[in-house]
């Protein structure tokens, strides 16, 4: 199967960029032919190429026609639909607020995938996509890469804050939550290291980094990967603080992607210290075992392959409707025009 994966950038290591990397590499391992497209290339594009996955920054003039498009971000998804007439697509929503994540409406987008409940609500309520076209597919970790660590100590000694939003702990800024996390850790006798692009200390190998720490402050897929290694995880980011992920809270936090909707508290020394106090090596091991069982990259890609096959089959049975596609393109361009002009309107939807 030939799969085109689109993303607004393939530069820095970030959420949807690494999602493309993990999925494309697994597809290739299974004998499929993934190609990644983004107008902005960089480090992640080079990682994909090193893994044998072709990467392009333009779709015109290619000696490649996909069987299906895996679409992240509406501009790139619509570009793929325009460049490859007759090819069906699956549109993915990875964020409940960024404008780039608003899923477009188009006749050949036959399924929509949301990575958590907030994204699902956005697809249904804001983009007006029928519920029967929407599937929630929760995030994952590559368990062959993020191997389980040795058992945690009875008391945590070393903590890691891993986020691209974190500043250096000594940076003088009102929103420097890294300094707040550091102070909370110090109040419990724990040292803290901060890694991420904003603080000038990025990491290329979090799978190795996690093994050096007992406690990790993170959100989203980073939190999932830390759990898979076996670290105790406190949900935390610039937006706020959540709880320690425990066996008791796992079921409520998993559909939220351990993400923004989980960060209900203000980042203060007291709230973060209270989360630290939930540390339990036994409980962290239970969380590790569950996430390793329920959030495997291999299972996710198997589900995606079935989804690709389903939309390809549906598209083969559908008559071509150029008029409907032109109407949908016009409605999309109207929406895009308003976005570019900074107007706050809901996406336009064409109806045949």
What are these regions (language model features)?
Residues 7-19, 166-175:
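A short, glycine/small-residue-rich beta-strand->loop->alpha-helix junction that serves as a flexible
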Residues 71-76, 93:
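Short His-centered aromatic/hydrophobic patch
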Residues 222-286, 290:
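Catalytic binding pocket for nucleotide-activated donors in carbohydrate/polymer assembly enzymes
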Residues 67-68, 208-221, 230-234:
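Acidic donor-binding loop of glycosyltransferase active sites
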Residues 15, 151-152, 263-334:
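A charged, aromatic-enriched C-terminal amphipathic alpha-helix characteristic of glycosyltransferases
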Residues 100-101, 110-132, 172, 176:
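A short, active-site helix/loop in glycosyltransferases that binds the activated sugar's phosphate group
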């Amino acid at each position: 199967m030939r799969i085109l994966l689109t993303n607004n950038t393939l530069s820095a290591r970030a959420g949807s960029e690494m999602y493309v990397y993990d999925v494309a590499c697994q597809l290739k391992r299974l004998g499929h032919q993934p190609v990644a497209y983004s107008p902005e290339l960089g480090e992640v594009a080079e990682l994909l190429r090193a893994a044998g996955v072709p990467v392009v920054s333009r779709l015109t003039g290619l000696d490649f026609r996909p069987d299906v498009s895996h679409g992240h971000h509406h501009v790139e998804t619509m570009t793929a639909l325009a460049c490859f007439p007759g090819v069906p697509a699956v549109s993915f929503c990875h964020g409940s607020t960024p404008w780039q994540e608003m899923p477009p409406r188009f006749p050949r987008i036959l399924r929509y995938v949301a990575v958590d409940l907030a994204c699902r609500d956005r697809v249904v309520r804001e983009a007006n996509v029928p519920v029967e076209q929407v599937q929630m597919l929760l995030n994952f970790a590559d368990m062959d890469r993020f191997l389980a660590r040795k058992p945690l100590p009875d008391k945590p000694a070393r903590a890691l804050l891993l986020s691209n939003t974190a500043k250096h702990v000594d940076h003088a800024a009102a929103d420097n939550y890294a300094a707040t996390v550091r102070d909370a850790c110090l109040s419990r006798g724990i040292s803290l290291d901060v890694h991420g692009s904003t603080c000038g200390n990025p990491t290329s190998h979090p799978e190795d980094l996690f093994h050096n720490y007992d406690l990790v402050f993170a959100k989203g897929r980073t939190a999932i990967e830390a759990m898979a290694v076996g670290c105790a995880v406190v949900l935390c980011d610039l937006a706020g603080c959540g709880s320690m992920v425990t066996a008791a809270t796992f079921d409520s936090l998993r559909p939220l992607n351990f993400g923004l909707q989980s960060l209900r508290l203000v980042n203060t020394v007291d709230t973060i210290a209270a989360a630290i106090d939930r540390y339990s090596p036994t409980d962290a091991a239970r969380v590790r075992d569950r996430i390793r069982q329920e959030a495997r990259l291999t299972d996710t890609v198997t589900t995606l392959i079935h989804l690709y096959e389903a939309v390809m089959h549906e598209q083969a049975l559908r008559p071509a409707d150029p008029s409907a596609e032109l109407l949908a393109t016009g409605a999309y361009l109207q929406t895009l025009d308003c976005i570019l002009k900074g107007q706050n309107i809901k996406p336009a939807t064409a109806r045949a």
